[in-house]
From Swiss-Prot:
ATP binds at residues 221-223, 486, 538-541. InterPro entries: Aa-tRNA-synt_II, aa-tRNA-synth_II, aa-tRNA-synth_II/BPL/LPL, Asp-tRNA-ligase_1, Asp-tRNA-ligase_1_N, Asp/Asn-tRNA-synth_IIb, AspRS_core, GAD-like_sf. The lineage of its organism: Bacteria, Pseudomonadati, Pseudomonadota, Alphaproteobacteria, Rhodobacterales. It comes from Paracoccus denitrificans (strain Pd 1222). The gene is aspS. This is Aspartate--tRNA(Asp/Asn) ligase. It holds the Pfam family tRNA_anti-codon.
Amino acid sequence: MSAYRSHTCGELTAAAAGSEIRLSGWVHRVRDHGGVLFIDLRDHYGITQVIADSDSLAFAALEKLRAETVIRIDGRVKLRDPSLVNPKLPTGEIEVYATAMEVLGAADDLPLPVFGDQDYPEETRLTYRFLDLRRESLHNNIMLRSRVVKWLRDAMWDQGFTEFQTPIITASSPEGARDFLVPSRLHPGKFYALPQAPQQFKQLIMVAGFDKYFQIAPCFRDEDPRADRSPTDFYQLDLEMSFVEQEDVFRAIQPVIQGLFEEFGGGRRVDTDWPRIPYAEAMLKYGSDKPDLRNPIEMQVVSDHFRGSGFAIFAKLLEQDGTEVRAIPAPGGGSRKFADRMNAFAQGQGLPGMGYIFWRKAEDGTTEAAGPIAKALGPEKTEAIRTQLGLGEGDAAFFLGGKPETFEAVAGRARNEIGRELGLIDENQFKFAWIVDFPMYEKGEDGRIDFSHNPFSMPQGGLDALEGDPLAVMGYQYDLACNGYELVSGAIRNHRPEIMFRAFELAGYGRDEVEKRFGGMVKAFRYGAPPHGGCAAGIDRIVMLLADEVNIREVIMFPMNQRAEDLMMGAPSEPTNEQLRELRLRVLPRE
């Protein structure tokens, strides 16, 4: 017999009754029922009930055990009384009568009990993550993640992709976030960077003549944390293909993502018709470039009904260039109480409130509009708004106005809140959409033009498109949205040096700077670069959706906290003076 176990704690069934066996695992819990001990012994595979009475040689030692002590048990498998069978456990038909026990690893008093589903502060959970990972729900999430990664890897090989690994230490490049810099000991004053993505390397793989690449890639970005984003590092399914257009990439990745959600989605419906929604349309209708299409609400522009109207706030606002008024339909939200709740939501978003109209049955049996805006507009205009929005008795509409960039994001969040409050969102499905035709550039608060998405994307229209208004240029860039999250992002790449130089010039990068920062890729493009494109799918976020979690740290084995700290390992930590001397660095005091 093995020194530690003949079976796992999830393996024994009624067929093993009468067998002499050996188990090892953690003491999940101990119950003393009047001289008979019941011990739930747990390992990675499951739980087996161990019993010992006062006649057992192991009784005295078992009686002193603390929870989470690691023990080895020798014993005999017995069938449970039929009334005591536990159908929730694979081992629920049997129990093991202990004849001998050895402590393999003692446990101190626990700062975080493993048994039960009590919630604990995140700081405690992350400090004692090794204990937290023993808890069933988190343990299952991490195992789900492992199965997802294996499934993705197999699916990519089946599609003819080849797996390659790209460097982890590389040069800094502008890819939308701050780099993590690594000082060079051999080259004082110079720094490497951890890659935000394998972007340049995967393009160089295509230039090198390989046709279809993928890897499960670690990415490093010094970002502000969110519930759906890690502040330091994450993993993505990264892929690139030669001689492809945008639709070719879509055809390659859809069966992978769709199949993954069908396999691990827990029976939730998986949408198979993935619409292509231009970025401008997504922002107009949904107030987001990652819309939750489970919510049927679509916003509409209703400026014409307010222009020159008796509702002075919007009428005056619409006299300014570039302004509009948008309506958010709220089917079933036609009550003042609901309007008050939504106004409270808007105030929580930093707005003074949202205008609203709701429709109700009048005394004469017709449908009439109510609310402050309705009084100011009059029945003719409110009826026109109702008709445009397709609303009726018992419904409402909420209104926001101004320059779209000042209110679109809040309008999108309000749309989501209205959908949730009114029960319009079907939680039992995954709905996907490709967001396409992203603007290549955006204007910052300082008035400067910069890339809005991926700087290595091919502009639609090629070089000619870059000779006009930069803000009118669209790129061959695309995101895949699912249930309000961005799951995939990608682009057809700019593989022509002359177009690349011009594209970067518009964003304020001179030719010399482009050569300095991206010299390897620019040089490669001068020696015959194929048209190529690809995308990357965020594995952490995908697993978060599949596990039905709302916090990405619930699907990462050892995550950072919201302040980008590893409470378990004590990172970040201060370097020693010797390390600083070797690297010729000095730490300046915080100003």
